[in-house]
């Protein structure tokens, strides 16, 4: 997900997106732990998306 797309969203939408990403991250970690994860690059991708959303939430809180 691009930061430009995220900047257009409201705080409520960002919180919803963050919750969805954290759920996805949990599911991916469980798959990795059980050896079922085929696409390991998704772990890194979701982790960075979570960081992007958290950064934008912090920016919007300060503004």
Curated annotation (Swiss-Prot):
The keyword Acetylation appears for this protein: no
Matching InterPro entries: Ribosomal_protein_uL29, Ribosomal_uL29, Ribosomal_uL29_CS, Ribosomal_uL29_sf
Protein name (record): Large ribosomal subunit protein uL29
Record keywords, A-Z: Ribonucleoprotein, Ribosomal protein
GO cellular component: cytosolic large ribosomal subunit
Family, per entry: Belongs to the universal ribosomal protein uL29 family.
Organism (species): Citrobacter koseri (strain ATCC BAA-895 / CDC 4225-83 / SGSC4696)
Transport in keyword set: no
Pfam families: Ribosomal_L29
GO annotation, biological process: translation
Gene3D superfamilies tied to this protein: 6.10.140.1970
Single GO term (MF): structural constituent of ribosome
């Amino acid at each position: 997900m691009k930061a430009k797309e995220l900047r257009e969203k409201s705080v409520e939408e960002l919180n919803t997106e963050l919750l969805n990403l954290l759920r996805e991250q949990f599911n991916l970690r469980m798959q990795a732990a059980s050896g079922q994860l085929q696409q390991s690059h998704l772990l890194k991708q979701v982790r960075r998306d979570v960081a992007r959303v958290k950064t934008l939430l912090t920016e919007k809180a300060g503004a």
